[in-house]
UniProtKB/Swiss-Prot annotation:
<protein>
    <recommendedName>
        <fullName>3-hydroxyacyl-[acyl-carrier-protein] dehydratase FabZ</fullName>
        <ecNumber>4.2.1.59</ecNumber>
    </recommendedName>
</protein>
<comment type="function">
    <text>Involved in unsaturated fatty acids biosynthesis. Catalyzes the dehydration of short chain beta-hydroxyacyl-ACPs and long chain saturated and unsaturated beta-hydroxyacyl-ACPs.</text>
</comment>
<dbReference type="GO" id="GO:0016020">
    <property type="term" value="C:membrane"/>
</dbReference>
<keyword id="KW-0963">Cytoplasm</keyword>
<keyword id="KW-0443">Lipid metabolism</keyword>
<keyword id="KW-0441">Lipid A biosynthesis</keyword>
<dbReference type="InterPro" id="IPR013114">
    <property type="entry name" value="FabA_FabZ"/>
</dbReference>
<dbReference type="Pfam" id="PF07977">
    <property type="entry name" value="FabA"/>
</dbReference>
<dbReference type="GO" id="GO:0005737">
    <property type="term" value="C:cytoplasm"/>
</dbReference>
<dbReference type="GO" id="GO:0009245">
    <property type="term" value="P:lipid A biosynthetic process"/>
</dbReference>
<dbReference type="GO" id="GO:0006633">
    <property type="term" value="P:fatty acid biosynthetic process"/>
</dbReference>
<comment type="similarity">
    <text>Belongs to the thioester dehydratase family. FabZ subfamily.</text>
</comment>
<keyword id="KW-0444">Lipid biosynthesis</keyword>
<feature type="active site">
    <location>
        <position position="54"/>
    </location>
</feature>
<dbReference type="InterPro" id="IPR029069">
    <property type="entry name" value="HotDog_dom_sf"/>
</dbReference>
<dbReference type="InterPro" id="IPR010084">
    <property type="entry name" value="FabZ"/>
</dbReference>
<dbReference type="GO" id="GO:0019171">
    <property type="term" value="F:(3R)-hydroxyacyl-[acyl-carrier-protein] dehydratase activity"/>
</dbReference>
Amino acid sequence: MTTDTHTLHIEEILDLLPHRFPFLLVDRVLDFEEGKFLRAVKNVSFNEPFFQGHFPGKPIFPGVLILEAMAQATGILAFKSRGKLEPGELYYFAGIDEARFKRPVVPGDQMIMEVEFVKERRGLTRFTGVAKVDGEIVCTATMMCARSKPAAPAESVVVKPDVVKPDVVKPDVVNPVVKES
């Protein structure tokens, strides 16, 4: 039995995800099957901006960014499984359960994220995810993403220069009044 391998290069990833530098954390999709699984790569470079402070002299890829990289992989799988979204729609990272970190990820590592579709219910899609370096598990988690609806156009608000004076703020115009009970 043969299976088709689907790969996605950075140009295709940029077409699917709204993330951009420095927050795009998926460099390539190695393979996927729509509605089932996706394997993606994050090449961890010492040039990542967060290594300046996490931690000086002992750079460690932040755990929350490992989770974000896996969440971005779930977003790609959702897009490839459900099709492109309507203008104004996004897939949002909606929740995480049972996140576990097994070992640090450091500059020079190539992190492989493997995400699998679990179920979809009431607009939420649940995925499991595993991140590995050199075949060794570095993180596991169960994640949810939600498909947003296009936002209604925002009302135009015009603030005239005479509405706010340096020593007076009109609460009914600039700051909504919050009544204490």
